[in-house]
Swiss-Prot record:
It comes from the Eukaryota. It is an enzyme of class 1 (oxidoreductase). Belongs to the reaction center PufL/M/PsbA/D family. [CaMn4O5] cluster binds at D170, E189, H332, E333, D342, A344. This is Photosystem II protein D1. Keywords: Acetylation, Calcium, Chlorophyll, Chloroplast, Chromophore, Electron transport, Herbicide resistance, Iron, Magnesium, Manganese, Membrane, Metal-binding, Oxidoreductase, Phosphoprotein, Photosynthesis, Photosystem II, Plastid, Thylakoid, Transmembrane, Transmembrane helix, Transport. The modification Phosphothreonine is found at T2. Pfam families: Photo_RC.
Length: 353
């Protein structure tokens, strides 16, 4: 009898917990994805803050020349970063218990792997939580689909690219200058500026910014005034009202006369779908481009592609970019190797005369 009562009590507790977790009445929705999201993001955030402030230098290249990244070791907000896990570790799973000591774990850049893996799991769960809340509210799932673009980009940079290159040391450092360094090295090694998927991503990001600014300014400029000229237009609206707050016909007419008739949308749904889809598809392509370049399927190479009738090279912009790439690659990991591979592979000229 006692066992039955205890089981019923535990079932009631579990049922109450389930109802609380999945309740849409909470100030912040938790959901089952949130059960995993909260601890993973808290772990990633707390370790990032501690490591950014106090982590010792990391032997990123695996050549016993540690690189400092934390504030207490001489960096500032701009130059500071979480240094990626050492090349000596490669792609091995490297939790604290795999190292001989905490000092060794820190020296080999263990915090980077810990932060990145928890962060990726956390943002994936955040995306799942968006879908879960939409489902429980009877909404369509497109919010989570849109969020999949930055999740895909982060996964490509922090996970797919290191896998393709064979080491977490090739991942993006977690800092401002570290991000720029990653971008420069990526251009030097993969010629990303000449990759069509990156071009689509640039069009998506900048085009999305342009369209968002155009839409916001058009809506703000075509509000339906419910007040007198002496009152603020904002005073004529209440949150959640059923009536339209702006005149889409007026906005459509204005934009059609500004450019041409068919350059503007007269359907609100198709307009907002376009505003969402343009940057999302662009960022999807960027993530796909990073993932292909991770396995060295690089941008187009048009080096020395134009020659005159005598066979002499006529330099193009592609050749200028190639020279810049070589210079950036020489500067990269200057202690790990003397020359980039494409320079070192060239046969040296004879010195015998």
């Amino acid at each position: 009898m006692t066992a039955i009562l205890e089981r019923r009590e535990s079932e009631r507790l579990w049922g109450r917990f389930c109802n609380w977790i999945t309740s849409t009445e909470n100030r912040l929705y938790i959901g089952w994805f949130g059960v995993l999201m909260i601890p993973t993001l808290l772990t990633a955030t707390s370790v990032f803050i501690i490591a950014f402030i106090a982590a010792p230098p990391v032997d990123i290249d695996g050549i016993r020349e540690p690189v400092s990244g934390s504030l207490l070791y001489g960096n500032n907000i701009i130059s500071g970063a979480i240094i990626p896990t050492s090349a000596a570790i490669g792609l091995h799973f490297y939790p604290i218990w795999e190292a001989a000591s905490v000092d060794e774990w820190l020296y080999n850049g263990g915090p980077y792997e810990l932060i990145v893996l928890h962060f990726l799991l956390g943002v994936a769960c955040y995306m799942g939580r968006e879908w879960e809340l939409s489902f429980r509210l009877g909404m369509r799932p497109w919010i989570a689909v849109a969020y999949s673009a930055p999740v895909a980009a982060a996964t490509a940079v922090f996970l797919i690219y290191p896998i393709g290159q064979g080491s977490f040391s090739d991942g993006m450092p977690l800092g401002i200058s570290g991000t720029f360094n990653f971008m420069i090295v990526f251009q030097a090694e993969h010629n990303i500026l000449m990759h069509p998927f990156h071009m689509l991503g640039v069009a998506g990001v900048f085009g999305g910014s342009l369209f968002s600014a155009m839409h916001g300014s058009l809506v703000t400029s075509s509000l339906i005034r419910e007040t007198t000229e002496n009152e603020s237009a904002n005073a004529g609206y209440r949150f959640g009202q059923e009536e339209e707050t702006y005149n889409i016909v007026a906005a459509h007419g204005y934009f059609g006369r500004l450019i041409f008739q068919y350059a503007s949308f007269n359907n609100s749904r198709s307009l907002h779908f376009f505003l969402a889809a343009w940057p999302v598809v662009g960022i999807w392509f960027t993530a796909l481009g990073i993932s292909t370049m991770a396995f060295n399927l690089n941008g187009f190479n048009f080096n020395q592609s134009v020659v005159d009738s005598q066979g002499r090279v006529i330099n193009t912009w592609a050749d200028i970019i190639n020279r810049a790439n070589l210079g950036m690659e020489v500067m990269h990991e200057r202690n790990a190797h003397n020359f980039p591979l494409d320079l070192a592979a060239i046969e040296a000229p004879s010195t015998n005369g």
